């Protein structure tokens, strides 16, 4: 157990910091102090995460580290349990990094800035808390904690149909949370003299195969909404299409990863027998999702909806990697989650920049803005190349691991592997079609005279917006050139889980 409560400080710091925002002064009705204060808290939080993990985490140790355990409700063994291992060591800093940049992207927000920035900090706390939770009921509470600020961010800032999108989001996610809670309590309290909610103790328990299957499915419903997995994905395009682009960065960069993390942390690690049964279906659904979402993306007029379907397609690789149950495949899935956290957040920032100048999200109302916005065009092109897995980018490193991951799986027949590989390849071929066509519609050709004439005189990205893009681009290229930067953190844990359970 850790001698100093590093993780507790990291998880709880944003909440009191957010509660102080209403007390901050706002000279002349401005929000400058609020913006800088929130950015400072996010940066401090990110530096705390970086310091803690750099100086107190052993990458060769597959067990839980920096463990903190404080009694809460002892009768059901509900404790404040935190810790990190190879599964969470990458996603937690990613949360801090993307949230800090999203706060910077939210600079133009002027409507109810106190509530907006307080909600961002509350969401920050919930997501970091989920990735560090070592108690299954605490995991559920953190899962629920981020729903409220996300709903506020969606319902109050965004497009004309933002209330519809926010309501759809809360119905889907709250509906998925019900089986998550039932499964968590059943797993912790069923059939043993001493109830336990501790992940470490739950990993050593065994359940009747029928119960394990029911538990697996109950958890899977919640993760299928968050990841998202077809057919529970329809909330995501609506949400991205209406949300403020800084909120979209948080959704694409972090929130989707909560589903993949839960699938590994609980379903794969705690319910290995059921996972072996459902793994082929994960692979099949993942392969279908890659092609389906890529096909639908090309028909989207709204730039943010097109990027949203791109995210759904890329999450298919995560499903295939998890379903492969191989070292290289699972490492590829984890790398894909981190890679997409960077690559998925950046296009929304750039789409927001384009919207701020053109006042339209529709691709057929843009056209030709590349001449007046060359910096935005360059960055958009760079991240489009990363999204279609150009060699030298993190997307290429992740997807090139998922392919051999499924091929090397011993539990699948040769025809199955060939079919899945062909479907994956089709999805990869479709990716440049919808991405490059989006670039063509936005930046090439002639100005659309039907739309706002100010498009031809649109101002290019400023220093703040370029800084956000560069901060996301550098690790994208760095991980692509040296993927061991991430793989060295999670490989020991992956090997341990696979050797003990599969």
UniProtKB/Swiss-Prot annotation:
Annotated transmembrane regions: 4-24, 39-59, 89-109, 115-132, 136-156, 169-189, 209-229, 244-264, 276-296, 315-335, 387-407, 418-438, 466-486
Entry keywords, A to Z: Chloroplast, Membrane, NAD, NADP, Plastid, Plastoquinone, Quinone, Thylakoid, Translocase, Transmembrane, Transmembrane helix
The reaction(s) this protein catalyses: a plastoquinone + NADH + (n+1) H(+)(in) = a plastoquinol + NAD(+) + n H(+)(out); a plastoquinone + NADPH + (n+1) H(+)(in) = a plastoquinol + NADP(+) + n H(+)(out)
Localisation: Plastid, Chloroplast thylakoid membrane
Protein name, as recorded: NAD(P)H-quinone oxidoreductase chain 4, chloroplastic
Gene behind the chain: ndhD
One of the GO BP terms on file: electron transport coupled proton transport
Enzyme class: translocase
GO molecular function: NADH dehydrogenase (ubiquinone) activity; ubiquinone binding
Similarity comment: Belongs to the complex I subunit 4 family.
Membrane topology: Multi-pass membrane protein
GO cellular component, one term: chloroplast thylakoid membrane
EC number: 7.1.1.-
Superkingdom of the source species: Eukaryota
Source lineage: Eukaryota, Viridiplantae, Streptophyta, Embryophyta, Tracheophyta
Record has NAD as a keyword: yes
Main subcellular localisation: plastid
Record keyword Zinc present: no
């Amino acid at each position: 157990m850790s001698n100093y409560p590093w993780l507790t400080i990291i998880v709880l710091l944003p909440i009191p910091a957010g509660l102080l925002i209403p007390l901050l002064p706002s000279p002349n009705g401005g929000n400058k102090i609020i913006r800088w204060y929130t950015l400072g808290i996010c940066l401090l939080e990110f530096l705390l995460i970086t310091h803690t993990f750099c100086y107190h985490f052993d990458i060769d140790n597959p067990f839980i580290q920096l463990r903190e355990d404080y009694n809460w409700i002892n009768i059901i063994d509900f404790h404040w349990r935190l810790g990190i291992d190879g599964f969470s060591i990458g996603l937690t800093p990613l949360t801090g990094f993307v949230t800090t940049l999203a706060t910077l992207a939210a600079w133009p927000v002027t409507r109810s800035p106190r509530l907006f920035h307080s909600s961002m900090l509350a969401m920050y706390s919930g997501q970091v808390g989920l990735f560090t939770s070592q108690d299954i009921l605490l995991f559920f509470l953190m899962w629920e904690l981020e729903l409220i600020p996300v709903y506020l961010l969606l319902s109050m800032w965004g497009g004309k149909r933002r209330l519809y999108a926010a309501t759809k989001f809360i119905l889907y996610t709250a509906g998925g949370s019900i089986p998550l809670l039932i499964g968590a309590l059943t797993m912790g309290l069923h059939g043993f003299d001493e109830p336990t909610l501790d992940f470490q103790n739950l990993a050593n328990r065994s359940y009747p195969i029928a119960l394990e299957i029911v538990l697996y499915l109950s958890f899977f419903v919640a993760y299928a909404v968050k990841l998202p997995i077809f057919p529970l994905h329809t909330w995501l395009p609506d949400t991205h299409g209406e949300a403020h682009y800084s909120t979209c960065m948080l959704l694409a960069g972090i929130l989707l990863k909560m589903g993949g993390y839960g699938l590994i942390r609980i379903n794969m690690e705690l319910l290995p027998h059921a996972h072996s049964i459902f793994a082929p279906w994960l692979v099949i659904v993942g392969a279908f999702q890659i092609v389906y979402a890529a096909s639908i993306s090309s028909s989207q007029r709204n730039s943010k909806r097109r990027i949203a379907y791109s995210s759904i397609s890329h999450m298919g690789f995560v499903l295939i990697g998890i379903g492969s149950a191989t070292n290289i495949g699972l490492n590829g899935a984890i790398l894909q989650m981190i890679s997409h956290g960077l690559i998925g957040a950046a296009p929304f920032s750039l789409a927001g920049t384009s919207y701020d100048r053109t006042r339209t999200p529709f691709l057929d109302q843009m056209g030709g803005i590349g001449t007046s916005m060359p910096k935005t065009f360059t960055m958009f092109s760079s991240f489009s190349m990363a999204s279609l897995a150009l060699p030298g980018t993190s997307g290429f490193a992740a997807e090139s691991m998922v392919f051999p991951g499924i091929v090397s799986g011993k539990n699948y027949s040769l025809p199955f592997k060939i079919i899945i590989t062909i479907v994956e390849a089709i999805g990869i071929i479709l990716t440049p079609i919808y991405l490059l066509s989006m670039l063509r519609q936005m930046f090439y050709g002639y100005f659309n005279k039907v739309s706002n004439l100010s498009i031809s005189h649109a101002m290019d990205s400023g220093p703040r917006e370029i800084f956000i893009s560069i901060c996301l681009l550098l690790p994208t290229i760095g991980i692509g050139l040296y993927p061991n930067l991430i793989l060295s953190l999670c490989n020991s844990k992956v090997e341990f889980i696979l050797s003990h359970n599969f």
